[in-house]
Regions:
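A glycine/proline-hinged amphipathic helix-loop "lid/cap" segment
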Residues: 1-56, 207-212, 297
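Alpha/beta-hydrolase superfamily serine-hydrolase fold, recognizing
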Residues: 44-49, 53-297
Length: 297
């Protein structure tokens, strides 16, 4: 029994009005009662949630902070669906975590989502945070946004302390993943899921006119340059996004960027969402928290 058959239904007709928003809404009800502080932050075109696990000091610009970009194929999920993961990350990193509820497909393009992520970063800068105090992190599609945001910030002369990616989708082109050996065993994604994602991304980009032209499809792995933040990636050994994780690490290393990939055998895509119930998820997030602490001093 896997999630793959459920996702396959939506992938056959991705443009139908599926109630993707209900996933995050339902997750809000299911979040356990805890002493974690969750503060809503208004951004120009979206919102964010500033999360502090018990014992973590307020986000006052004096210590480290994490910008977290959730996964969900640019289509679904949010701060609620990722609430347990983010709370654990806040605990292990000893840092507030700003989770961006960026605009989603199909009504909004990936470029618009990226702008929301940039706005969240700027919100922290206006609160007094310096780049070397800020870590960019994301899972799945959020990994794409985190790397792309790091590249945009690099062009603006900003270098965050580190980049952390969990099971990242880093290449929008579908063919390399569909040809990967894990495509037949991935418990989450079949080949049709990548067909559907490509269709949704292209359709939304075509409707977003930038400087008189449709938004271009951006491939971050084609724009790896020296000077990007040090990078840690955690990925399952059985998922098809292992392809993207390894390709990114290879290209980052070739550009002189410190890049580490930790492969978790026997796990599924984004298994860290099962924290704290699954021991491996908790161990992974603890390691990520240690990495963030070390990167920010």
């Amino acid at each position: 029994m896997t999630i793959r058959p459920i996702l396959a239904v939506g992938s056959h007709a991705p443009n139908l009005p599926w109630p993707w928003g209900l996933i995050d809404l339902t997750a809000r009800v299911l979040l356990p009662v805890s002493a974690t502080v969750r503060e809503t932050v208004a951004l120009p075109h979206a919102s964010a949630q500033l999360v502090r696990a018990p014992g973590v000091l307020p986000a006052d610009g004096t210590r480290r902070v994490v910008v977290y970009l959730h996964g969900g194929a640019f289509l679904t999920c949010g701060a609620n669906s990722h609430g347990r993961l983010v709370e654990a990350l806040s605990t292990f990193a000893d840092a507030p975590v700003l989770v961006v509820n960026y605009r989603l497909l199909p009504k909004n393009s990936v470029g618009m989502a990226l702008q929301d992520c940039h706005d969240a970063y700027q919100w922290l800068r206006l609160r007094g945070y310096q780049p070397d105090q800020i870590v960019l992190a994301g899972d799945s599609a959020g990994g794409y946004l985190a790397l792309t945001l790091a590249q945009r910030l690099q062009r603006e002369g900003e270098e965050p302390a580190a980049l952390v990616m969990i099971s990242p989708l880093l290449q929008l082109a579908k063919e390399p993943k569909q040809a990967h050996p894990n495509i037949d065993t991935d418990a989450m994604f079949g080949a049709g899921a990548f067909d559907a994602l490509a269709e949704l991304v292209a359709g939304a980009a075509a409707k977003n006119i930038v400087d008189g032209k449709p938004e271009e499809i951006y491939e971050p792995l084609e724009h790896i340059e020296p000077g990007l933040p040090r990078t840690l990636t955690h990925v399952s050994g059985s998922e098809v996004l292992l392809h993207d994780a390894r390709l990114a690490a290879s290209r980052l290393a070739a550009a002189g960027v410190p890049a580490e990939v930790r492969v978790w055998p026997g796990q599924i895509h984004d298994f860290q969402l099962a924290a704290p119930m699954v021991p491996e998820a908790r161990r992974s997030l603890r390691q990520i928290g240690d990495y963030i602490r070390e990167a920010t001093g």
